[in-house]
UniProtKB/Swiss-Prot annotation:
<comment type="similarity">
    <text>Belongs to the NADH:flavin oxidoreductase/NADH oxidase family. NamA subfamily.</text>
</comment>
<keyword id="KW-0285">Flavoprotein</keyword>
<protein>
    <recommendedName>
        <fullName>NADPH dehydrogenase</fullName>
        <ecNumber>1.6.99.1</ecNumber>
    </recommendedName>
</protein>
<keyword id="KW-0216">Detoxification</keyword>
<dbReference type="GO" id="GO:0050661">
    <property type="term" value="F:NADP binding"/>
</dbReference>
<dbReference type="Pfam" id="PF00724">
    <property type="entry name" value="Oxidored_FMN"/>
</dbReference>
<keyword id="KW-0521">NADP</keyword>
<comment type="function">
    <text>Catalyzes the reduction of the double bond of an array of alpha,beta-unsaturated aldehydes and ketones. It also reduces the nitro group of nitroester and nitroaromatic compounds. It could have a role in detoxification processes.</text>
</comment>
<dbReference type="GO" id="GO:0003959">
    <property type="term" value="F:NADPH dehydrogenase activity"/>
</dbReference>
<dbReference type="InterPro" id="IPR001155">
    <property type="entry name" value="OxRdtase_FMN_N"/>
</dbReference>
<feature type="binding site">
    <location>
        <begin position="307"/>
        <end position="308"/>
    </location>
    <ligand>
        <name>FMN</name>
    </ligand>
</feature>
<feature type="binding site">
    <location>
        <begin position="162"/>
        <end position="165"/>
    </location>
    <ligand>
        <name>substrate</name>
    </ligand>
</feature>
<feature type="binding site">
    <location>
        <begin position="21"/>
        <end position="24"/>
    </location>
    <ligand>
        <name>FMN</name>
    </ligand>
</feature>
<dbReference type="InterPro" id="IPR023663">
    <property type="entry name" value="NADPH_DH_bac"/>
</dbReference>
<dbReference type="GO" id="GO:0010181">
    <property type="term" value="F:FMN binding"/>
</dbReference>
<feature type="binding site">
    <location>
        <position position="99"/>
    </location>
    <ligand>
        <name>FMN</name>
    </ligand>
</feature>
<keyword id="KW-0288">FMN</keyword>
């Protein structure tokens, strides 16, 4: 089965095609440091056989977190704690990345004010953010760069830049949240400029042999007034030379009705993969091994991320291998349960 085939991106060889996507656990404290929960949470999925684990959205600045309970990577102390997590996860054969994020106008903590490309609140219950100056934009780009350097120091196999779900990069990309009239607003090319400059800065410090992933929301679900899959194709083509994989999600930049069903975002991965000729990760209420195999076998994505399913069942990969009589290496202490 394709699900159990290895997959190589640059120097990173994954033992299977299953990804644990970044999911905020809101389990840190105001320091942004990892704790015992994070160690158990991620290491358990590695023991369970997941090929690629992406650590949750991690703030590049204190007010770049989504909440005060999110992880941070704005200090050297954060890198030290993350380094221990990386070592533990790698012991069991998984590769590990970290998602670098700035929440922008969606920041709900107490370590500063929310900022955004334009002074427009997410909804009527949200704070109105401060519009970023050009100098402040440059400072955030440098913060992404510094965070990437710390991620390398911590030993991560890859990094993912968070450009989805209505956070700062997504806010620049979408015409629903970006009303600037300078070089960072207006046309698709201008709205992509911030993302491009972030990626260029990160490329300067991130090892060339290690992958850079980009997570995007390929559909705003606002009847064409926001980002559509076709515009996301254009955005990806602008930055394609700076990334190695596109992690394709959707929604989050503005309130919208989304019709949810198993695999509802897979079609977006398929569009990006085929139109941009880049490897993709598919995600979106995928919880069945046969669905995973269909996605991979029909070339709709190169990797498949299971969010809720891996929260429910950390041993999805092991139990699926047993179900399908696939011979894989089971963790020694657990062999009797699966052989």
């Amino acid at each position: 089965m394709k699900i159990f085939e290895a997959y190589t991106i640059k120097n990173m060889c994954l033992k299977n095609r299953i990804v644990m996507p970044p999911m905020c656990m809101y389990s840190s404290d105001n320091t942004g440091n990892i704790n015992d929960f994070h160690l158990v949470h991620y290491t358990t999925r590695s023991i369970g056989g997941v090929g690629f684990i992406i650590v949750e959205a991690t703030g590049i600045t204190p007010n770049g977190r989504i909440s005060d309970k999110d992880l941070g990577i704005w200090s050297e102390k954060h890198a030290e704690g993350l380094s221990f997590l990386v070592k533990e996860v790698k012991k069991y054969g998984s590769k590990i990345a970290i998602q670098l994020n700035h929440s922008g106008r969606k920041y709900e903590g107490t370590s500063g004010e929310p900022v955004a490309p334009s002074a427009l609140a997410f909804d009527e219950n949200s704070k109105t953010p401060k519009e970023l100056t050009k100098n402040e934009i440059k400072e955030i780009i440098l913060a992404f760069k510094a965070a990437a350097k710390r991620a390398e120091k911590a030993g991560f196999d890859a990094i993912e830049i968070h450009g989805a779900h209505g956070y700062l990069i997504n806010q620049f990309l979408s015409p629903l949240s970006n009303f600037r009239d300078d070089e960072y607003g207006g046309s698709t090319e201008n709205r992509t400029r911030f993302l491009k400059e972030v990626l260029e800065a990160v490329r300067e410090v991130w090892p060339k042999e290690k992958p850079i992933l980009l997570r995007v929301s390929a559909e705003d679900y606002r009847g064409g007034s926001g980002i559509t899959p076709n515009e996301m194709v254009n955005i990806i083509n602008i930055v394609k030379d700076l990334i190695d994989v596109v992690d394709v999600s959707s929604g989050g930049v503005a309130p919208a009705h989304i019709n949810l069903y198993p695999g509802y975002q897979v079609k977006l991965s398929e569009v990006i993969k085929n139109e941009c000729n880049v490897p993709t990760i598919a995600v979106g209420l995928i919880c069945d091994i046969n669905m995973v195999e269909e996605i991979l076998s029909n070339n709709r994505a190169d990797l498949v991320a299971l969010g809720r399913e891996l929260l429910r069942n950390p041993y999805f990969v092991l139990s699926s291998a047993r179900l399908k009589n696939i011979n894989i290496d089971f963790p020694k202490p657990y062999e009797r349960a699966f052989n």
